[in-house]
C-alpha cells in the first residue's frame, strides 16, 4: 500500500512506531498531487515549502513524545478558509490576489494538533453551487469518472480524498456542500450541528447556514478530524459552549436497538433506481445489525429548496457587499469614478452563479418584497426545524438518500439552474434545521459511480450518527473501494 493510500489512523500508527516520518508521508502526498491533480483539478494552491516545514516540526514533536492523532498528517483545506500568508481565493476572480493576515480558528486548531497543510482546494465560487463547476479556476473532476462532476460546493475536498491527494480535508456545508460531494466521490462527509465548529475565518456565504466539517476516507478519520476542530470559540458568537465528546471512543459498532426514522417525503418517485437499491440494501444491513426502523414524516420538506434559496441568497447579497475593490481583492482598472469602480470591479470579479444569487437575494430583501419572501421563508424554516424536533421524539437518527442521482456529467445542468438546485433536495433541510448529518459510502451505480446514504442526527448528536455510520461501514466494504486514477 502506498503512503498516500493510508487513512489518518493507519498513518498515525506508522508515525508512532517510527516506521516512517511525516516528511516522507508529506513528500509522497506532494508527489501524488503533482502526478494526479492536473487531471482532477482539486487544488487551487499547493504549498510544498510550508508543508515540508510543518512536517519537520511534526517529526520533532513525535520524537519528543508530543503526538496528537493528527500530528504529521497531510491535510488540505477548502479555499474558503483564511490561511495566514497563503492565498485564499474562494475560487473567485475577485479574491484572486488576497493573502490573509491570520488563520481561521479551524485552521489554527489543525495546526495546533500538528497537521500538515499541503494546499487549498477548489470549490464552487463563494461556495455557491452543487457541482464544482462555478470555480474561476475551472471545474473539479470526479476521480471515479473524469467526465462527471464531483459534487459541490466542496468539490476539491471530496475529489482530493477520492484521488488520494490528501489524507483528510476540511470543507464547509451550507446546503449539502460536504455531504453531496462526499456521496458522489465515495467518501465520508460530516456536516456538524450549527455552532459545533467555529466559523471564524471562514469566508461567509450564508451566515446562518454555513458550517465547517471534515471529508475523510472512513468514519474513524471523520471522528478524529471533528475532535480536532470542534468546540466553543469566543471569536465566533454563533459557536455553542457544549461539551465535546470523544468521538472516536464512541465508535463501538453497536447499533442494536437504535431507532432509525424513514421519512416518507424522501423516498419518492423519481429517485434514481441505483440510489433506491443502495438505500434498500442499507436498510437491510442495519436490520441485520439490530437497528429498528420507524416510518416518520417531515411534512414541510417540499418547501425546503425554495426556503433555502431565499434565505441563503438574502444573506449572500449582504455578505458579498464587502467586495468592492477598495479594501482587498480585485480592483478594476481605468474606472471613471468611485461608483464606476464598484460596478466594474463586481462585474469583472464575480461569476454568473454568484451574480444570480446576489440578485435573487437583493430582490428578496427589497422594499415591498421582504415580507412576501424573506420573512415568509424564515417562518417556513421554523416549521422545518419543528418537523425534525418532533421526529426525534420517536427516533435516534434519520436515514435518507444524500442525492436523488449519482454524479452527472460536467455541463449537464449548467444551463438549467433549477435542476441544479434540486440536486440538494435531501441535504438542504438539515441546514435549515441547524442539525447534523453524515454521508457514508453505501453502494455503486451501474455506471461505476459511488452512492452515499445520509444519517441525520439530533442537534449536537454527532456521536450517535458517527456510531451508526461506523457500524454500517464495518458491515460493508464500500468505503474500501478506490477510484482507478
Curated annotation (Swiss-Prot):
GO BP: any one term: translation
UniProt keyword annotation of rRNA-binding present: no
EC number of this enzyme: 6.3.5.7
Active site: 78 (charge relay system), 153 (charge relay system), 177 (acyl-ester intermediate)
GO molecular function, one term: glutaminyl-tRNA synthase (glutamine-hydrolyzing) activity
Top-level taxon of origin: Bacteria
Top-level EC class as recorded in UniProt: ligase
Keywords: ATP-binding, Ligase, Nucleotide-binding, Protein biosynthesis
Signal sequence region: none
Cellular component aspect of the GO annotation: glutamyl-tRNA(Gln) amidotransferase complex
PROSITE patterns recorded: AMIDASES
Reaction(s) catalysed by this chain's protein: L-glutamyl-tRNA(Gln) + L-glutamine + ATP + H2O = L-glutaminyl-tRNA(Gln) + L-glutamate + ADP + phosphate + H(+)
Keyword hit for Iron-sulfur: no
HAMAP family membership: GatA
Family: Belongs to the amidase family. GatA subfamily.
Function: Allows the formation of correctly charged Gln-tRNA(Gln) through the transamidation of misacylated Glu-tRNA(Gln) in organisms which lack glutaminyl-tRNA synthetase. The reaction takes place in the presence of glutamine and ATP through an activated gamma-phospho-Glu-tRNA(Gln).
Subunit structure: Heterotrimer of A, B and C subunits.
Protein name: Glutamyl-tRNA(Gln) amidotransferase subunit A
Organism annotation: Geobacter metallireducens (strain ATCC 53774 / DSM 7210 / GS-15)
Lineage per the UniProt record: Bacteria, Pseudomonadati, Thermodesulfobacteriota, Desulfuromonadia, Geobacterales
Gene expressing this chain: gatA
